[in-house]
């Protein structure tokens, strides 16, 4: 949470990790049945080294650009997090997983508990 460029660098590993599942889907289903928004970002993927799986700064994520990172992740300021989570809720998402493996984990969890989750409790009446 915080500076957008730093957030992107700390979370770029996640869309890289997801790319393994996208490759599996492409191998199982006809590509034309899958949305380009999901499959298009892996065209520059050259491989994946599981020795650096889910690792911040891993070369596995070199093919993942800012646009893809922004689309796959919740990044930026507290207000940015609230805004993106509200957009996801409007789209029908009712669960959200916080990956506490990007640095400042305790601070992120504290901010979510203090500033983000309560704002959704006021809106929905539930967590």
State the predicted function of each range.
Residues 1-90, 121-126:
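An alpha-helical appendage that flanks or caps ligand/catalytic pockets
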Residues 70, 96-98:
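Hydrophobic faces of well-ordered beta-strands that scaffold small-molecule active sites
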Residues 105-126:
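C-terminal helical cap(s) of enzyme catalytic domains, especially alpha/beta-barrels
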Residues 74, 101-107:
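Acidic-and-aromatic substrate-binding clefts and catalytic sites of carbohydrate-active enzymes
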């Amino acid at each position: 949470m915080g500076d957008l460029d730093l957030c992107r660098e700390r979370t770029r590993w996640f869309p890289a990790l997801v790319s393994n599942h996208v490759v599996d889907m492409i191998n199982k289903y006809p590509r034309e049945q899958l949305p380009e928004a999901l499959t298009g970002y892996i065209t520059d993927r050259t491989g994946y080294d599981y020795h650096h799986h889910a690792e911040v700064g891993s070369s596995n994520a070199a093919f993942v650009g800012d646009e893809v990172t922004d689309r796959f992740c919740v990044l930026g300021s507290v207000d940015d997090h609230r805004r993106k989570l509200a957009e996801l809720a409007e789209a029908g998402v009712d669960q959200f997983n916080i990956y506490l493996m990007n640095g400042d984990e305790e601070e992120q969890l504290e901010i979510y508990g203090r500033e983000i989750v309560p704002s959704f409790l006021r809106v929905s009446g539930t967590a």
